Every structure is written in C-alpha cells, then in structure tokens.
C-alpha cells in the first residue's frame, strides 16, 4: 500500500460539523492519518492541523484559492489529472510529493490511453523528474 499506518483514517471535508472535527483532531493528533479535501485544507492549517494528504479534483481557477497559505512540505497532494494546474505548480515549487489520479473525465481517458499504454517511458520520466509518487 502507499501509506503504512496503524492510525485511524480521517477524511476531512468542509462541513457544518467541521468545528467538532477540528476539536477532536487537536485533542488526539497522533491518532489520525488525515486526508483533507481542498475545501477544508486552509481551515485545518489555520488551526495548525497538518494533513498528511490533501485531495483536489476540480480544474476551475477558483479551486486554487484553497491553497493560498504556505503549503507544508510534508503534505502530499492527491490530484486528479484535470485539477487546476496552478495547484500542481505550487506543490512542485514547494518540492512536495504529488500523486495523480483519474476520476473518469473523458479527456483523461484519452490521456490514459496515449500516455500509459503507448508511452510508459514518458510517464516514468515525469514522475522521477517532478518527485511525484
């Protein structure tokens, strides 16, 4: 598996219950492996809670507003291939690790076919070059 941990997985989104969640995470930080959605990321950082992973899927420019604060280098970005490129660039400049995923957008399916099946060497080079997972 990608992550080896005995911790409880906490997937944190921006919800009406987020204040209660923040209290629990602050009281027992060692208990949780935290995956934050992009919409909860800044809020967690404001409370000095550093997620191990932050996930972003949306390619719209407004999504980059969820990443205005300094990015902790230890936080791994899990990004869809259609995610906003400004977010990817910010994590690359920060020398943070990045893992890409495909949520099924039709254009990404074409990209998968071309890149993974026909040009696997290009994909491996891109991962090595940019310190991605």
Regions inferred by a protein language model and the residue ranges of each:
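A short, charged/proline- and glycine-enriched loop
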Residues: 2-9
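Acidic/Gly/His-enriched mid-domain segments of enzyme catalytic cores or analogous surface patches
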Residues: 42-133
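Contiguous, well-ordered alpha-helical segments that form the cores/surfaces of helical PPI scaffolds
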Residues: 9, 19-20, 38-46
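N-terminal active-site wall of soluble small-molecule enzyme domains
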Residues: 16-29, 43
